Amino acid sequence: MGRGHAFGVREVTINEGRLEADVFVENLGGHKLPTAYPSRRVWLHVTVRDGAGRKVFESGALRPDGSIQGNPNDADPATFEPHHDEIRANNQVQIYESILGDANGAATTGLLTAVRYLKDNRLLPHGFEKRSEERV
C-alpha cells in the first residue's frame, strides 16, 4: 500500500497444529480506503512458506489477468466475496470494497441503477468513531 496506510502482523502462534497470524490493516488517510468509486478494492495477499521456502498457503494471489484468486466477483459480477474476520482456506480472500445493489437486491456495477450497498467494508480513516458507522 502507499503512504497513509499501515499493515503488519501483530502475533503468530501455533494452536492445535494450526498456524494463526493476527494481522492489522490501518487507514491513516483522511477518507475511506479504497475511495468512493465502487470498482476500487484493496485486498490482503497472504503467503505462508515452510522452513524450506515452499509455499504451503496462499490467499488473495493476483492472477496474470488481473483477477484475484478466491474472488467470485471477478468471474461473476452478480456475486461477491463476503467480509472475513478469519481466513481459513485459500479460496477465501479479504477484500475491502463497496458492492452496490439495485432495487431488487442484486449486485450491480451501474451507478444509475444502484440504490444501496450490499457490502461496504472499506477501511475507515484512523481516528474515525467506528460506533457511529454502520457496517453493511
Predicted segment positions?
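Short, conserved sequence motifs used for protein processing/export or organelle targeting and
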Residues: M1-V136
